[in-house]
């Protein structure tokens, strides 16, 4: 069996499961990038998919993806302002989300998901690969 693309793993962990979007993103990134992050780390993200669902909140899956980008690009002892690679990747991810979905807000994305019920909507052109 061929290795799944990142978006396919996200769909695998999220569609038809009890996992929140945040947990699905975490599980997919952890597996895809062989991060070997602990169950304790997963628990840190687990409430995001439940508690961020307000009209003003950012998508929890997006938030987890930003955290994973930071994890993969930050250097030991490096401050935020020094991580230009991470900032560039986050800017590209934000541009993709806004261009493809028109929003990063949870409620608006859920409405899109309801409109496309039964279809898998997380399909970035590059398969969601980070090039670190």
Protein language model regions, located:
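Conserved phosphate/anionic-ligand binding catalytic regions in large, soluble enzymes, centered on
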Residues: 53-64
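DPxDG-like acidic metal-binding loop motif
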Residues: 63-72
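An acidic intrinsically disordered interaction segment
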Residues: 17-37, 92
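C-terminal binding/interaction regions
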Residues: 88-132
């Amino acid at each position: 069996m061929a290795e799944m693309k990142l978006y396919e793993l996200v769909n695998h962990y999220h569609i038809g499961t009890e996992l929140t979007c945040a947990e699905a993103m975490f599980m997919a990134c952890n597996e895809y990038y062989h991060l070997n992050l602990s169950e304790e780390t997963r628990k840190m993200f687990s409430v995001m998919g439940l508690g961020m669902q307000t009209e003003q909140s950012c998508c929890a899956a997006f938030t987890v993806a930003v955290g994973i980008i930071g994890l993969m690009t930050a250097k030991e002892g490096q401050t935020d302002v020094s991580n230009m690679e991470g900032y560039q990747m986050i800017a590209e991810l934000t541009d993709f989300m806004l261009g493809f979905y028109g929003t990063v807000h949870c409620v608006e994305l859920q409405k899109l998901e309801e409109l496309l019920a039964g279809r898998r909507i997380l399909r970035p052109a590059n398969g969601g690969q980070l090039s670190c």
